[in-house]
């Protein structure tokens, strides 16, 4: 089975791409830009296209970007489809049980190593990640449904082939392009949702007032502006939104936006902005060298990009966080989590922040119709009604 599911903003609903045509797979870095050129032309010819680019495809666009080597996962995978239809989520709400590959002490030790690099002036920030793994009994549709019900996102995607499935409820836009207009929306800054309204508002205000999170967000925003500026028309870049807070059932997130105009190809855009600065650190080249040294495993699709092209060329890619890779042959799953490390980072707090991003796997996505009574107050309204 080959299929793709995406959120269609025009229909304001999830849609499934059907009637697959050709599939393009890259295991060699030189093939990645070629495939991007091919699928961009396919969309202009009236086909739908969906696929992913792995984090380790970075050197396809810039040999200075270092990373570990992927083994079984493609560097890029895209399929053409002839049509779309509405997609229905399942009601299955079973928790997904995965465990960290590394011990907590290993993550904390890596944070301390990064702080050494920061003290020496090698970098300003490094995005450190780890993996959760486990055997899988849930179906791909059930997993995707759980993730999307728990964390609804306009950037959610499901990709499935005979050998793998990828379920993403990413809240982060990598870039979208419609006509000449291109937008990126880097995300930096996370807080857990509170158990009750007062705690939730406290966590929200803490994120809103955090100088550390704002500094991180601004640092990454500057990198994104620089990356995007290379492929945008002179004078067209703007920053319409700074430090916006977005609520999800398990976390608060902080984003900023950059918008510009471009006439560059899809491959040229990727060569300038991939991987997204929010999942590497600053400066990107040195941060990725440190990531390759400290992280125990390749990232694969996690922190890469998943996306689609519609007939006519409208394009959207997410930053593939909150994303599960399922090996259908080995019947196991991998889910990445991470945190941005800066000079004043507290190792224990960074570990807690990264683990908070895994709550989507077990947080109950209760349908509202099960509630017979709900507390309402004029000041607070109904807590978590959104």
PLM features: what roles do these ranges have?
Residues 1-386:
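Extended alpha-helical targeting/anchoring segments
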């Amino acid at each position: 089975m080959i299929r793709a599911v995406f959120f269609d903003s025009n229909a304001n609903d999830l849609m499934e791409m059907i009637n697959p045509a050709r599939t393009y797979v890259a295991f060699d870095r030189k093939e990645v830009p070629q495939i991007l050129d091919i699928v961009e032309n396919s969309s202009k010819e009236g086909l739908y296209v969906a696929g992913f680019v792995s984090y380790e495809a970075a050197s396809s666009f810039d040999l200075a970007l270092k990373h570990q080597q992927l083994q079984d996962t493609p560097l890029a995978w895209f399929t053409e489809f002839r049509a779309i239809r509405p997609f229905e989520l399942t009601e299955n709400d079973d928790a997904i049980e995965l465990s960290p590959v590394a011990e907590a002490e290993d993550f904390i030790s890596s944070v301390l190593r990064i702080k050494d690099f920061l003290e020496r002036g090698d970098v300003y920030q490094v995005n450190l990640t780890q993996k959760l793994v486990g055997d899988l009994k849930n179906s791909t549709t059930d997993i995707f449904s759980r993730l999307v019900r728990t964390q609804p996102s306009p950037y959610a995607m499901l990709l499935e082939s005979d050998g793998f499935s990828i379920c993403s409820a990413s809240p982060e836009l990598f870039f979208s392009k419609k006509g000449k207009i291109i937008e990126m929306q880097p995300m930096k800054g996370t807080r857990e949702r509170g158990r009750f309204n007062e705690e939730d508002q406290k966590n929200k205000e803490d994120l809103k007032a955090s100088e550390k999170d704002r500094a991180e967000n601004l640092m990454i925003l500057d990198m994104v502006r620089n990356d995007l500026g290379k492929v945008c028309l002179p004078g067209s870049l703007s920053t319409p939104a700074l430090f916006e807070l977005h609520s999800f059932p398990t976390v608060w997130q902080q984003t900023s936006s950059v918008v510009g105009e471009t006439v560059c190809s899809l491959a040229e855009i990727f060569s300038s902005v991939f991987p997204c600065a929010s999942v590497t650190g600053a400066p990107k080249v040195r941060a990725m060298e440190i990531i390759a040294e400290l992280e125990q495993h390749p990232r694969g699709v996690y922190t890469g990009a998943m996306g689609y092209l519609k007939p006519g060329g409208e394009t959207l890619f997410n930053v593939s966080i909150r994303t599960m890779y399922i090996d259908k042959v080995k019947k196991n799953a991998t889910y990445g989590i991470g945190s941005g490390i800066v000079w004043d980072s507290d190792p224990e707090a960074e570990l807690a922040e990264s683990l908070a991003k895994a709550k989507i796997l077990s947080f109950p996505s209760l349908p509202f119709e099960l509630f017979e009574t709900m507390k309402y107050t004029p000041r607070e309204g109904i807590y978590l009604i959104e």
